Amino acid sequence: GGTSDYLTAESYTPEDMIRAMDQAGVDMAVGCSLGQMVDNSFIAETMALHPTRIVGFGQVNPRNVDATETIDNLAQKLGLKGLKLHPTMHGYHFADHGLLDPIFDAAQRNKLVVLVNALDDPFCAPLSVEEISRSFPDVPVLIAHMGTVWNVNEAILVARRNPQIYLETSGSQLLDVKLAYRSLGASQIVMGTDWPGSDFDLERAKIARAIPDAGDRALVEGANLQRLLGIQG
């Protein structure tokens, strides 16, 4: 089994991902489905096969009538540790309390971290993420891609006034990470790769250039997410 890179339609397997991790010196990483082909069972099977290497995040379309039941299932039966939301792919505006409040309520009762795919489009502007997140301060939220390209400053602003909101760095520019680090410090930044869209070693190099302090870099490269997910060790 495996998943496809949405840019190339080439297939990649979990073993390919682990090899890329090994080459870059990465111990553990999050894996999840693409928005185009949600397969929570496959992610759970992958995590079960590689429990010390891959942490599985599930995915759901909030517009589905069984969305909250799906979240309960992916957390309680499949054992996944987080929830990815893709407003652009699934066609909803994030600042919709009627749609998103039940999703965040389900994430809260299942103690899931929420990852929001948030490039710079009107479906998922950081201020919209904040609108929902501020009603659920106990649910950690990762703004994926930091709102790249045009919403980075807004993402930094939102994270600065909401301690439960974190910025995930995949797809962002080096300067963006520097700006976030200067404004927030290291405690609300989480390194991501969007593999296979990028490579683990390239993303680590970006973080090393943006965050020269070794202790702060350790937080961004793993310790922050380790704490949010309750991973021991």
Residue ranges of predicted features:
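Mid-to-C-terminal alpha-helical segments outside catalytic/metal-binding sites
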Residues: 1-28, 186-188, 201-233
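Catalytic pocket-lining loop regions of alpha/beta-barrel enzymes
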Residues: 81-82, 94-190
